[in-house]
Amino acid sequence: MVDMDRISISLPTKLLGEFDEIIGDRGYASRSEAIRDSIRDYIIKHKWIHSLEGERSGTITIIYDHHASDLMERITTIQHDYSNLIVATLHMHMDHDNCMEVVIVRGDAKIIRELTDRLTSQKGVKQVKLNVMVPGGNIPE
């Protein structure tokens, strides 16, 4: 038998409700099993992103609450700190409260990861997605 640790987490009611719907749709026997699968997926994604090396191009997509205290200023400051990586940015107002920013990047994978981690850790950022492409010359035909 696998050793198990019991943990406790706090979640917003709406988020838990959506998670419970997914649990039902996917046929999980319990929340615990669904959470274990989610954590496994998170670990796999983290390992994949942190295994990237060399020159890469891609996008970092950020969804954030534009009402969050000085968040837009913090995001802009971080982007300026990595201006050597950033090729372009696109800003979209999703609704009254949320904005999406797409940052096109090109450079060393480790530095792109560092930028992504800094953006992810900002309070008020709801979601960050890194999509990395291999250099064009390395794409099989």
UniProtKB/Swiss-Prot annotation:
UniProt keyword terms in alphabetical order: DNA-binding, Metal-binding, Nickel, Transcription, Transcription regulation
InterPro entries the UniProt entry points to: Acetolactate_synth/TF_NikR_C, ACT-like_dom_sf, Arc_rbn_hlx_hlx, CopG, CopG/NikR_regulator, Ni_resp_reg_NikR, Ribbon_hlx_hlx, TF_NikR_Ni-bd_C
Cofactor binding comment, as recorded: Binds 1 nickel ion per subunit.
Single GO term (MF): DNA-binding transcription factor activity
Lineage top rank: taxon: Archaea
BP-aspect Gene Ontology terms: response to nickel cation
Keyword DNA-binding: yes
Residues where Ni(2+) binds: 80, 91, 93, 99
Cofactor(s) needed by this chain: Ni(2+)
Pfam family, one: NikR_C
Membrane-spanning parts: none
PANTHER family, per database record: NICKEL-RESPONSIVE REGULATOR (PTHR34719:SF2)
Family in the record: Belongs to the transcriptional regulatory CopG/NikR family.
Function summary: Transcriptional regulator.
Full protein name: Putative nickel-responsive regulator
UniProt source species: Methanococcus aeolicus (strain ATCC BAA-1280 / DSM 17508 / OCM 812 / Nankai-3)
Upper taxonomic lineage: Archaea, Methanobacteriati, Methanobacteriota, Methanomada group, Methanococci
